[in-house]
Each structure stands twice: as structure tokens, then as C-alpha cells.
């Protein structure tokens, strides 16, 4: 927040003064490549006045620009490893045409205009999460980003596609070696390549293990994150049992019929059977129960 404030006021530190220029140029190149980023608000937990609260928050421009620099680093690292035929890339398969067709039908059902000639990336970039129907479409867009994983190689490139469909480029993780295991391996391999030396033996010996290790790690991290958010929501709502809240149904699982809805204030996301309701619809929900020890909240539709 401070960096964005300083940039807006024209007093940014020289080390970040050019970040908006570089970030905007990278965003333009992303558009030209056919890449796409989902502008879904993230849910945050904030300590405030001796208590906790939750909020939905979209990234600041400076955060988007910083992310573009990280992506640029990962793309450059990926090209180094592909050129040396040793390393590990972050991959994402392209969405199946029928999945895009289903998304187009969903947008039509929600009353969100998607011109026939407009590509999927261009359509997604124009969606506004502040509009309930468009937020519902954005939530459904996440289904097109499934299948992300890692592909390792040593000595020759695999026949599988090494691209990342959302970025429309080859990409790897190298910017967070202290919190993400794969970055530790990828960054050391890139340092060796840059120095004209062979990749470290210890890194090469474990390359084939990394994709499954990272898959397991990501599953555990997501479960932990969801549990923390659930507990924070229960803390925020523990004194409000019986209250009715305005909410938006943002998604419905086509198989189970379970709906996901968002309450703006306090920022809560929970589930209820949709019972035939369509995504994008405004609903009123009642908080029936809070189980703090389990981090569980129970809602029902208000009459």
C-alpha cells in the first residue's frame, strides 16, 4: 500500500520508480501473446483493534506490475533450462474447446455479453469482479485453469507440451526458493547454466521426484489455507448467529448442485445447495450456527 501511495504521489523510491512502466509494458506483451490473468478478488485476514476481520481485496496496480516482473524472471529461467535440456517447468494445458463453449453458454445465461469474434483471453480481461454476474463468470473461468503441474527433464526435452497456457509462454518457478521447494532446484540449475557449468548433481538426481512432491505440497498448502480462512470466518461471525446477510451466488457445481456464495461485509465465502438458483443471483442468507473449534459456519436461505 505504501509503495502504491508513493507512486501515486510521485515520490516513489528510485528502485521502484520504473516499475509501473515495465509492468504496463509486460501486461501489454501478455495481451499480445494471448495470455490471461484472472482478476478474482482475494480473501484476506486482518488484525485490527485487537481482533480479526476478513475482506475481499483486488490486487493493487503495483502488485500486478511486480507479478509481471516475477513472471518475466520465470520465463527467462525456463528458456535457460530448455536451451540446456535440463530443469523443471511449470505447465498448464490449454483449455478444451468444449470447456470454453460451456463458459460462453454460462456467460450468455448470466446476461454477460461475449461477442462471437472476441477471444477467451480478451473476454476475461474485460470482466469486472464488482458486478455480481461478471464475478460469477470469473469464478467459472477458474475451471479452465485446471491441470497445472510440473514437468522435469534431463538430457532431452519431453514430447509433452512444456507451455503454460494461461501465460502463453514457457515458465518456471525460481523467485521464492525459501518457501517453495521447486524454486531451490530451478534457481540453482539456472545459476549453473548461466556460469557455463553443468547443473548440480544433487539437483539432477531429484528432478524426477519434484513434480509429485510439489503436487503433494500444494494440496497440503491449500488445505491449510482453507482451514485458516474458515477459522477466521468463524471468529468474525461467532457473535452474529441469527443475522441475515446479503450475498451473491457466484458458482454452482454442475454435478452436486452445491452453490458457493459470497458475503461482502464481513468478507465470507460459504456453500449451500443452490436448489435451482443460478450463479450471479443476489440472495439473502441466515447464519444458523458457528462451530469455532471446527472453524465451521452453517447458513440457510432467508425467506
What are these regions (language model features)?
Residues 1-281, 290-297:
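Electropositive polyanion-binding surfaces
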Amino acid at each position: 500500500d505504501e509503495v502504491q501511495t508513493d507512486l501515486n504521489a510521485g515520490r516513489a523510491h528510485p528502485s521502484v520508480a520504473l516499475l509501473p512502466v515495465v509492468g504496463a509494458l509486460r501486461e501489454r506483451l501478455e495481451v499480445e501473446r494471448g495470455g490471461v490473468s484472472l482478476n478474482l478478488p482475494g480473501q484476506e485476514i486482518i488484525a485490527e483493534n485487537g481482533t480479526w476481520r476478513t475482506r475481499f481485496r483486488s490486487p493493487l496496480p503495483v502488485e500486478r506490475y511486480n507479478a509481471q516482473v516475477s513472471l518475466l524472471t520465470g520465463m527467462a529461467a525456463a528458456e535457460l533450462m530448455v536451451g540446456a535440456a535440463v530443469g523443471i517447468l511449470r505447465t498448464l494445458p490449454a483449455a478444451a474447446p468444449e470447456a470454453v463453449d460451456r463458459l460462453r453458454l454460462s456467460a450468455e445465461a448470466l446476461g454477460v455479453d461475449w461477442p462471437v469474434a472476441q477471444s477467451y483471453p480478451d473476454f476475461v480481461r474485460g470482466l469486472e469482479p464488482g458486478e455480481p454476474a461478471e464475478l460469477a463468470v470469473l469464478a467459472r473461468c477458474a475451471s479452465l485453469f485446471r491441470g497445472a503441474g510440473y514437468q522435469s527433464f534431463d538430457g532431452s526435452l519431453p514430447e509433452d507440451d512444456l507451455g503454460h497456457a494461461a501465460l502463453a509462454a514457457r515458465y518456471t518457478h525460481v523467485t521464492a526458493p525459501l518457501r517453495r521447494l521447486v524454486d531451490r532446484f530451478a534457481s540453482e540449475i539456472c545459476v549453473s547454466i548461466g556460469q557455463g557449468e553443468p547443473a548440480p548433481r544433487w539437483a539432477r538426481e531429484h528432478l524426477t521426484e519434484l513434480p509429485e512432491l510439489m503436487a503433494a505440497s500444494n494440496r497440503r498448502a491449500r488445505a491449510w489455507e482453507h482451514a485458516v480462512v474458515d477459522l477466521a470466518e468463524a471468529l468474525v461471525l461467532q457473535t452474529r448467529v441469527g443475522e441475515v446477510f446479503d450475498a451473491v451466488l457466484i458458482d454452482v457445481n454442475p454435478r452436486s448442485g452445491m452453490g458457493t456464495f459470497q458475503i461482502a461485509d464481513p468478507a465470507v465465502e460459504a456453500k449451500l445447495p443452490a436448489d435451482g438458483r443460478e450463479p450471479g443471483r443476489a440472495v439473502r442468507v441466515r447464519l444458523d450456527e458457528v462451530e469455532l473449534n471446527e472453524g465451521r459456519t452453517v447458513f440457510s436461505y432467508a425467506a
